[in-house]
């Protein structure tokens, strides 16, 4: 039985890249139609007025306007875009 492991075999060297999720446009910012506002897995934040939801739950602006984050009840948030 060898007591030394053969050189050059590493077990730890791998890591996945970050997915670049999160807020892309913050409250008060101006957006154009089609701009991505929030990237997420599942609905952490729900689409509000003038905001669309992609099949991967990405929230995007449907009109040009100003982004506002609002509460829906006690435990939910939504993002809306209002014309300026």
UniProtKB/Swiss-Prot annotation:
GO molecular function: structural constituent of ribosome
GO cellular component, one term: cytosolic large ribosomal subunit
Keyword Nucleotide-binding set for record: no
Disulfide pairings: none
Keywords: Ribonucleoprotein, Ribosomal protein
GO biological process: translation
Region called Disordered, residue ranges: 1-24
Record-linked InterPro entries: Ribosomal_bL27 (IPR001684), Ribosomal_bL27_CS (IPR018261)
A matching Pfam family: Ribosomal_L27
PANTHER family in the record: LARGE RIBOSOMAL SUBUNIT PROTEIN BL27M, RIBOSOMAL PROTEIN L27
Family: Belongs to the bacterial ribosomal protein bL27 family.
UniProt name for this protein: Large ribosomal subunit protein bL27
Species of the source: Pelobacter propionicus (strain DSM 2379 / NBRC 103807 / OttBd1)
